[in-house]
């Protein structure tokens, strides 16, 4: 059972923390409100796949939250050497015996929460730091991910 979902920087979600009801959850909302994106993020964290392909094959600039990219570009063009945008999806799981292999305290909860869970992080490859720095000098709204 998932006890908490945290999504940072993925598509529509700049920062989302959701604690599902242990019995029943209905996801409703207007078109383009993030219902499918929420389910996609959960599946991505659980399997590392999206649309039947690995995350690395499917990664594209539209995965990154546009507000975070805009803020990053604004800060960089102002001369502030801010960190590159990242995507982080965390699934906190019920503390049960069969899930203890997934137990750890490497999550963003403060104070530290030692519990079973799964996380996925998408961040720039340091091997391409020169290319990314060059892009940042004249940045476009889409983060290069090729």
Model-identified regions with their sequence ranges:
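Pre-Walker A-like glycine/lysine-rich segment at the N-terminus of P-loop NTPase domains
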Residues: 1-48, 56-68
């Amino acid at each position: 059972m998932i006890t908490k979902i945290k999504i940072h920087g993925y598509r529509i979600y700049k920062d989302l923390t959701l604690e599902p009801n242990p019995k029943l959850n209905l996801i409703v909302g207007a078109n383009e409100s993030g219902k499918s994106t929420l389910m996609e993020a959960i599946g991505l964290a659980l399997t590392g796949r999206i649309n039947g392909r690995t995350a690395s094959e499917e990664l594209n600039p539209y995965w990154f939250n546009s507000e975070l990219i805009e803020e990053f570009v604004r800060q960089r063009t102002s001369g502030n050497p801010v960190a590159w945008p990242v995507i982080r999806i965390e699934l906190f799981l019920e503390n049960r015996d069969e899930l203890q292999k997934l137990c750890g305290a490497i999550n963003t909860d403060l104070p530290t929460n030692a519990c079973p869970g799964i996380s996925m992080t998408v961040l720039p490859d340091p091997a391409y730091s020169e290319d990314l720095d060059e892009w940042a000098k004249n940045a476009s709204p889409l983060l290069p991910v090729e």
